[in-house]
Structures are given as structure tokens and as C-alpha cells.
């Protein structure tokens, strides 16, 4: 039976310590030809838990006769997914972004973008 103030302090401190054992979250952003998604992962009871927290549509647009990615919009979608993490109280400690390997953008000597962000038809 718990009946002393010191016993109650110990129990309270155990509950506080348990509440402070928050999960460590990791974010994976997968950007594909037709959609993108944010997957948040963490470990729970020795198992990896994955949760899709944000999804968006994707596709190329024709610009100057070339198929191009809307890089600024894609960047904004990544930021929107990060905002969703904050909204649900699951802030990642790290993030990785996966995209395509055959599309390109040209840079000048100062690493400034020259021209469009060119994509190939993913068919």
C-alpha cells in the first residue's frame, strides 16, 4: 500500500520518466513520377513502425518544348510534409529524399541553375 509522500514522489517520477521516453523519428521522402510521399519511421518494442503521413501528386509539365519537373513545387511539397510532422507532434531527427537518377539540371560555374529541370519520359 502506498501511503507516504516519498512513495508518491517516486511513482510520479517514474511516470514522468516514462512520458519523457519519446520515440526518435526518421523521415523518408519518396518522390516518384506520379506521386510523392513522406514515410515516418520509429522503433517501438523492438519493431520498426512506418507511417505514411503525407502524399502529393507529381508529374512533369511541358516547358519550352521539353518535359520538366516543377522543382519549386516539389520543394514546397517536401516542406508541407515537414509541417505535417510538426502538426502531429512527430519531429524527425533526420530525413532522406529519394528521386530519379536520369533527370538533370545544368549549373553554371557559380552553381546557379541554367535553364529547365529536364526530365525524361518515365514510360
Predicted regions and their residues:
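N-terminal glycine/serine-rich phosphate-binding loop of ATP-dependent small-molecule kinases
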Residues: 9-116
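Conserved small/polar residues in nucleotide/adenosyl-binding loops
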Residues: 121-123
